[in-house]
Amino acid sequence: MSQSYINVIGAGLAGSEAAYQIAERGIPVKLYEMRGVKSTPQHKTDNFAELVCSNSLRGDALTNAVGLLKEEMRRLGSVILESAEATRVPAGGALAVDRDGFSQMVTEKVANHPLIEVVRDEITELPTDVITVIATGPLTSDALAEKIHALNDGDGFYFYDAAAPIIDVNTIDMSKVYLKSRYDKGEAAYLNAPMTKQEFMDFHEALVNAEEAPLNSFEKEKYFEGCMPIEVMAKRGIKTMLYGPMKPVGLEYPDDYTGPRDGEFKTPYAVVQLRQDNAAGSLYNIVGFQTHLKWGEQKRVFQMIPGLENAEFVRYGVMHRNSYMDSPNLLEQTYRSKKQPNLFFAGQMTGVEGYVESAASGLVAGINAARLFKEESEVIFPETTAIGSLAHYITHADSKHFQPMNVNFGIIKELEGERIRDKKARYEKIAERALADLEEFLTV
């Protein structure tokens, strides 16, 4: 592929990081950003890497998975992290930034780089003859979204309005749940949390009275599109959930079940199912429980489910308008397209969730786009690192049930040997191993 530059489309967190990484490797970049020509409902300025919702890049401690990811990115020369550190504001253990100062600094560092040419224009076609990183965000313009949709054979680039909570399997009380698939079809693939009639009535009462998170103004018209939040379903009638995600039919108690039940009934009054969410089996999601409750309310209400009294939520349910790819089928672990090899994708459209995760994906995509340009082999970061585990998760998850994911210790490769029971000590050990493995990886 003969060319003299690399395209980057989109100057959000992922695109800005990708462009900077490419330019730092001595390769000219054409960075396309449509803001300035065409606005979006969310953005207030034309600056790069504008933080639309929150000014927080979340926890900074290494015992927090996103803190580990940020430390890895610092060591990889992230322009996003450099700008965040320079514009940080007091926020306890979190890294929060002056919103305007942060985006202005990213804009200056990227736009003033001698090898980056900024082009204020909307791209409506996918380049076929130039290495290109596409990082156009969750609200990709309709024209370009249509081209990506076609590239994916009409599949895998679709709106996402809801996600169910995901739980650390080690925090589920296994004495209160049982393994079974409905009607015993196939393998016993679900953990089932049975409820008596009274438990269900109490749960329903708590759910319909729980406080929902407010929607951003630009999301309101999309609220009910393509999904049914569990709390909305519950408000339609006391038995509505019993014909939906809490349907007990075909999920009889096992013979050795000793927990509470209504009389001699062989089938629970209601059942909440949990499905394995990652290949390692360390994460489970609550099936059909997409929600827009406030996070504190999710914890309060969903911990009423038998077996989840002490559950740790690695991701709470969320609802907002988004578009993302079927990355397990469409992307390599390097963020390179399987269908059109000159293309890389980065940011929320790949199925990573969160500011830091978006920037991290742009960092990896930028590094690999530069390596392809130089005819060098692409790199896959170790699965023991946060940045590597995120790339692995979105490209190896079950495609049929794939949903956006933020970084968490549940997706990072387990430590070898006996499990460390103290959570803080375990996370410290995972972080220590991650940074050691990253250093070794960078010296090879």
Curated annotation (Swiss-Prot):
Its cofactor is FAD. FAD binds at residues 10-15. It catalyses: uridine(54) in tRNA + (6R)-5,10-methylene-5,6,7,8-tetrahydrofolate + NADH + H(+) = 5-methyluridine(54) in tRNA + (6S)-5,6,7,8-tetrahydrofolate + NAD(+); uridine(54) in tRNA + (6R)-5,10-methylene-5,6,7,8-tetrahydrofolate + NADPH + H(+) = 5-methyluridine(54) in tRNA + (6S)-5,6,7,8-tetrahydrofolate + NADP(+). SUPFAM superfamilies: FAD/NAD(P)-binding domain (SSF51905). Coiled coil: none annotated. One of its GO terms (biological process) is tRNA methylation. It comes from the Bacteria. Its EC number is 2.1.1.74. Gene3D superfamilies: FAD/NAD(P)-binding domain. One of its GO terms (cellular component) is cytosol. Signal peptide: none annotated. Keywords: Cytoplasm, FAD, Flavoprotein, Methyltransferase, NAD, NADP, Transferase, tRNA processing. GO terms for molecular function: flavin adenine dinucleotide binding; tRNA (uracil(54)-C5)-methyltransferase activity, 5,10-methylenetetrahydrofolate-dependent. Belongs to the MnmG family. TrmFO subfamily. This is Methylenetetrahydrofolate--tRNA-(uracil-5-)-methyltransferase TrmFO. It comes from Streptococcus pneumoniae serotype 2 (strain D39 / NCTC 7466). The lineage of its organism: Bacteria, Bacillati, Bacillota, Bacilli, Lactobacillales.
